[in-house]
From Swiss-Prot:
Short name of one Pfam family: Ribosomal_S2
Source species of the chain: Geobacter sp. (strain M21)
GO BP: translation
Amino-acid biosynthesis among keywords: no
Biased composition range(s): Acidic residues: 236-255
Keywords assigned: Ribonucleoprotein, Ribosomal protein
Name of the protein in its database record: Small ribosomal subunit protein uS2
Taxonomy of the source species: Bacteria, Pseudomonadati, Thermodesulfobacteriota, Desulfuromonadia, Geobacterales
Amino acid sequence: MSNITMKELLEAGVHFGHQTKRWNPKMKPYIFGARNGIYIIDLQKTVRLFKNAYSFVTDAAQAGETVLFVGTKKQAQDSVAEEAQRCGQFYVNDRWLGGMLTNFSTVKQSIDRLKRLDAMIADGTIEAYTKKEQLKLAKEREKLEKTLGGIKGMGKVPGVLFVVDPKNEEIAVSEAKKLGIPVVAIVDTNCDPDDINYVIPGNDDAIRAIRLLTSKMADAVLEGGQARNARLQTGAEEEFSTEGEEVVEETPAEA
C-alpha cells in the first residue's frame, strides 16, 4: 500500500485552506486552526482519511471497477489527464457535460461519432470530402475530442469518481449520487463534504497539492489492477493445470 507522509503533504501545501471568510462550516471537523486569515487543514486527519480512500480505490480496481478522474479547473487539468492515463483510466478535464453519467447513452452517441471521425482520418476516407467539408469535420472532431477525449474508451458509467474540488464539480457529484456511484474527492475548506463518500481534506487549488493526491490515487488504481491481474493469472494457471492432467485408469492386478 502506498503511504503518504506528513512531510509530503506539507511540502505540497496540502494544509492550506481558503480564507476564513470563504468557508463551509461543515468542514469544521477537518480544520486545525487559522493563520493570517487562512484556514489550516488538520493533516493528521488528511493522512487517516487518505488511507481509507486509497484502500477503497485499490479494492475497487481489484474488483474490476473503472475510475473516472474529474477536474476541470485550470490547476487540475494536467494532473487529472496525465495520472488517469498513467493508470489506464478515464478523465474529464475540460468541461462537464450535463448528463455525462445520468444520460450516458446519449453521450455515448457523441463518443461513437468521435470514433468515426478518428477512423475517417486514420483510413483516409476523409479525403473523399471537399476541403471545406474536411475543415468542418476537423473542427467537429477537435471540439468532441476536447470534451470527450478522456472518456473515449469508456463503454459504461464508471464504478468510482475521483474528484478535484467537488464545489466546482457539483454537477458531476450530483449525477454520481443519483446513480449510487461512490465519490472520492479532495475537499477544501469551502466545500460541502456531505455528498462525498471518501473525503480527503486538502488544498484543491495548488497545483503541487493536486498533483500529489491525484498521483497517489492513480497508484491505488495500479496497485488494485496488479492484484487483480495476479489473481486472474493464478486462476488461469490452476485451470490449465487441471485441464492438463491425464486421467489414468487403474487396471486390476493380475492374480
